[in-house]
A protein has these predicted regions:
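Flexible beta->alpha loop and helix N-cap segments adjacent to enzyme active/binding sites
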Residues: 1-168
Length: 168
């Protein structure tokens, strides 16, 4: 990654703990391009090639759909939650690491994480364990320690009609 950045004349800064730095940017409501680890294939971002944003503001869904993803306004975004907290957010959840099932969002949390709750009160979450993806887990945990909500908005690192990015 460093060679590509230098080759393109881009300014960069190496950080010791990217999870901590990214969590702090999310708290400030920045959009974070999260690129780490192995490539991902398929239509779901699972924490290696992701666009991340805070789920705490409803308008973040519109910002991503219109200004970054260039897609329809009604398209929902998925929450990524650390597995230990899944029962705090979802009714009868299972350990779903691949965003394949929808669950009802606990009523008390619907207003706390509006950017990732579908119009019918459900969400299609990714439950993230430290064993499966340590850096992504640490990012979500760090966001939770700063905000009280152990969830981030996670969408694929691409724009409408394009594949997920594979390299920097």
């Amino acid at each position: 990654i460093k060679e590509i950045l230098i080759g393109r004349g881009l300014v960069y800064k190496y950080v010791e703990n990217p999870s901590e730095v990214a969590a702090k940017y999310l708290v400030r409501n920045y959009v974070v391009g999260w690129f780490q680890g192995r490539m991902e294939a398929g239509s779901r971002a699972l924490g290696n090639r992701s666009i991340l944003m805070s789920p705490l503001k409803a308008e973040n869904k519109n910002i991503l759909n219109h200004k970054i993803k260039f897609r329809e306004h009604f398209r929902p975004f998925a929450p990524a939650v650390i597995i230990e907290k899944m029962h705090d957010y979802f009714v009868n959840p299972r350990e779903e690491g691949f965003m394949t099932c929808s669950f009802d969002v606990v009523q008390e949390k619907r207003e706390s994480i509006p950017a990732v709750v579908h119009v019918d009160g459900t969400a299609r979450p990714q439950m993230v364990s430290r064993e499966a993806n340590p850096r992504f887990y640490d990012l979500i945990r760090g966001f939770g320690e700063l905000t009280g909500e152990y969830v981030v908005l996670n969408t694929s690192f691409n724009v409408k009609g394009e594949p997920i990015v594979q390299h920097p």
